[in-house]
Amino acid sequence: MSEQQMTNEAAKTLDGWYALHDFRTMDWASWKLLSSDERQSIIHEFTGLLEKWGVAQKEGKGSQTLYSIVGQKADFMLMILRPTMEELNQIELEFNKSRLAEFTIPAYSYVSVVELSNYLASGDGDPYENPHVRARLYPELPESKYVCFYPMDKRRSGNDNWYMLSMEERRNLMRSHGLIGRSYAGKVKQIITGSVGFDDYEWGVTLFSDDVLQFKKLVYEMRFDEVSARYGEFGSFFVGNHLSLDTLPQFLYV
């Protein structure tokens, strides 16, 4: 392999479940015009959808979670993981056809696939048969109290072009970057989804924790790592609180 080919060698990825982050804003003014019985009927229909989608998680064929979003960017986020893009689209359509969707306004969405790169991969055999790898590619989304989502790119400008680095340089940088993430094991669960060709950024990062301050600490610490400081470009950050079937009615109460 030539030196130029080595320089431009692309990282290979292991790909798992497809992911949809669907952010909605409630039309509270229209929602308030409904009678209490009408609202309860709509909430009942929506919880029925959530329970239906939850069957896939029990069967190990996907996962989903719901969070209320803090701030003006959105009111809630539905995150869905499924084996195929078709199943992801089907759930999106099911929600869009529901009565609750009539009282929501799309705020933002992100389409991607759970991804592991070969920067840090090692070992022999089929990685898709490795239980540790499978748990990361096909995760059950936790019911952590808090979530943080943001999209990101690797910079491609001037002397700070990630894609002009050799595989060895990128691997070394990602190794030190990964050490920071692993230092938060037990405090933050991180799911990386790849979105090159799927959405406007290259990756989506979803963080879960029972201590919301861990998001701030983790992201801030990573800012000093060269991968983020020199090559990272970030989109909007969304932070929210977990919504369960028990707390959903209170969220929608007016």
Curated annotation (Swiss-Prot):
It comes from Bacillus subtilis (strain 168). Fe-coproporphyrin III acts both as a substrate and a redox cofactor. This is Coproheme decarboxylase. Pathway: Porphyrin-containing compound metabolism; protoheme biosynthesis. The keyword Signal does not apply. Involved in coproporphyrin-dependent heme b biosynthesis. Catalyzes the decarboxylation of Fe-coproporphyrin III (coproheme) to heme b (protoheme IX), the last step of the pathway. The reaction occurs in a stepwise manner with a three-propionate harderoheme intermediate. GO terms for molecular function: heme binding; metal ion binding; oxidoreductase activity, acting on the CH-CH group of donors, oxygen as acceptor; peroxidase activity. Gene3D superfamilies: Apc35880, domain 1 (3.30.70.1030). It is an enzyme of class 1 (oxidoreductase). GO terms for biological process: heme B biosynthetic process. Keywords: Heme, Heme biosynthesis, Iron, Metal-binding, Oxidoreductase. It comes from the Bacteria. Its EC number is 1.3.98.5. It holds the Pfam family Chlor_dismutase. The active site is at Y150. Fe-coproporphyrin III binds at R136, Y150, P151, M152, D153, K154, H177, Q190, S228. Belongs to the ChdC family. Type 1 subfamily.
